[in-house]
């Protein structure tokens, strides 16, 4: 790392990033005003696509699931790296995105996770273009969709499964306001939707028939008794439950 930091091109790129801060902030705040819940990132994706073109990336396009990708070409056959930040936020489309400023501090829903990272991606692309740095391998910039919640990393999973677009030797995700460290080999995750089915019926006249909600409750109770290893740290949670139509109706279906 010390050797890399001494390279003139890297020094020039770092200087450019500092000088580009005002533009980066401007684009950051503009993107904050674009609603982008998971599965509804289209408007923000188009904004990012245009900015990637302006930044000098090649093969800029929006893929089948809505990811925006652009490539900074390398000089040879070196490792191919993806650098990514996700376009979706956790906030519903109707959320008030009014931007507030107190002193030098800006605030609004989604301003951090992960809109700032997308602005940083664009600035990094401009820095490479301005300084002409080219490594041996390609750097693929990706503004990926559906990272949050039930999006379940849909965009980035698609990017890695899309072999027509080539393989990746490394992946860097910008996804935290904390710049004091790097997480190496991040935690994996699995998400499941489990649905319980029954015939349904009236809670009085149909009393005694199998009740999916009761079954789901028993399942949740058993899950809560699971014992997991401390190393590697392993966690679980039943995060959302849905089902039922009325207080006096035996549900025909429920899910967790």
Q: Model features per residue range: what roles?
A:
Residues 3-105:
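Acidic/His- and Gly-rich active-site-bordering loop/insert found
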Residues 39-42, 106-119, 207-214:
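Short, conserved micro-motifs enriched in small and acidic residues
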Residues 206-250:
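Acidic-enriched catalytic cores of C-N bond-cleaving enzymes acting on peptides and small amides
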Residues 30, 122-130, 218-224:
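Short glycine/serine- and small hydrophobic-enriched flexible loop segments
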Residues 105, 110-187:
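Acidic/histidine-rich catalytic neighborhood of metal-dependent amide-processing enzymes
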């Amino acid at each position: 790392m010390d050797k890399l930091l001494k390279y003139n091109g890297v020094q020039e790129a770092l200087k450019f990033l500092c000088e580009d801060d005002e533009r980066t902030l401007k684009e950051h705040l503009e993107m904050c005003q674009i609603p982008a819940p998971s599965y509804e990132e289209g408007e923000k994706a188009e904004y990012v696509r245009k900015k990637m073109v302006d930044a000098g990336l090649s093969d800029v396009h929006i893929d089948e699931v809505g990811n925006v990708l652009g490539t900074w070409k390398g000089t040879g056959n070196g490792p191919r790296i993806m650098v990514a930040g996700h376009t979706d936020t956790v906030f519903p489309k109707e959320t008030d995105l009014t931007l507030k400023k107190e002193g030098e501090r800006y605030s609004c829903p989604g301003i951090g996770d992960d809109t700032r990272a997308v602005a940083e991606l664009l600035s990094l692309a401009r820095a490479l273009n301005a300084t002409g740095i080219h490594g041996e391998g390609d750097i693929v910039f990706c503004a990926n969709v559906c990272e949050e919640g039930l999006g379940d990393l849909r965009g980035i999973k698609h990017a890695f499964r899309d072999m027509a677009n080539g393989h990746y030797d490394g992946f860097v995700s910008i996804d935290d306001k904390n710049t004091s460290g790097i997480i190496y080999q991040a935690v994996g995750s699995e998400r499941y939707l489990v649905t319980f089915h029954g015939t349904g019926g009236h809670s009085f006249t149909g009393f005694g028939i199998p009740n999916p909600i009761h079954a789901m409750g028993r399942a949740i109770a058993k899950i809560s008794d699971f014992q997991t290893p401390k190393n590697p740290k392993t966690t679980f949670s039943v995060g959302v439950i849905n089902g039922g139509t009325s207080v006096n109706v035996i549900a025909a279906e429920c899910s967790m």
